[in-house]
Amino acid sequence: MNLAIIGYGKMGKTIEQVALDRGHTVVARIDNPNFTPAEIAHADVAIEFTQPDSAKENILKCFEANIPVAVGTTAWYEDYDAVAEIAKAEGKALFTATNFSIGVNILFHLNKQLAAVMNNFDEYNVTMTETHHLEKKDHPSGTAVTLAEGILAQLDRKKKYIGLLKGQSADISAFDLHIESKREPNVPGDHTITYSSEIDDITIRHTAKSRMGFAKGAVIAAEWLIGKKGVFGMNDLLNF
């Protein structure tokens, strides 16, 4: 496939490496937010990894260029419903994921199942920690938010999540799911969910060893998206 990469930072360069290794051609490398749809129109599909304030405009440029787009940018989801409606109404293809890693999406699946089981055991309190590299600006991470939403959907005793950077404090009630965010050098991503009681802990965790898992998942999603119309996510790709 002919691929346009929108966002040519560390992740974009890793995506390029994976795409080339899988026999694809990168026909556009976009690192300027003022690019035009014409610059990507010759691609079969685009992968977008930029910043939250650029994502919506970048997606709409892909729609204007009439190419499918797989979006890995997070923290732009206040615009998601409007963008998804445009995709459906105009017959475009939009694939979004808070995390393209296959392993993380397995964690999403296990997380929901565990929360459903733990709904019957009130003696356990659930908390979450997420750690990323210093360059990651948003917190909690999109992955942590997806995990939190999975827990809240299954665990009746938690009503909302509260995300705090390490060292921050806030009033956290028994009804709140506390997410602690840490920013440390050279950490691609680590997410841990712990159910703790007076007698034991139950923990599930995903630790990324590099950006390669995210990049490979994004390229696989882009391959899958070609020729489709509509709005999709990792559950569609993985048949969860």
Specify the residue positions occupied by each region the protein language model found.
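C-terminal substrate-binding/catalytic lobe of Rossmann-fold NAD(P)-dependent oxidoreductases
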Residues: 2, 10-38, 120-240
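Short acidic/histidine-rich motifs immediately flanking catalytic phosphotransfer sites
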Residues: 40-47, 63-68
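Short glycine-/small-residue-rich Rossmann-like dinucleotide-binding loops
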Residues: 50-51, 74, 183
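Rossmann-fold NAD(P) dinucleotide-binding segment
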Residues: 52-72, 80-83
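Rossmann-fold dehydrogenase core element
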Residues: 68, 83-101, 118-124, 128
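Rossmann-fold NAD(P)-binding glycine/threonine-rich loop
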Residues: 73-94, 105-116
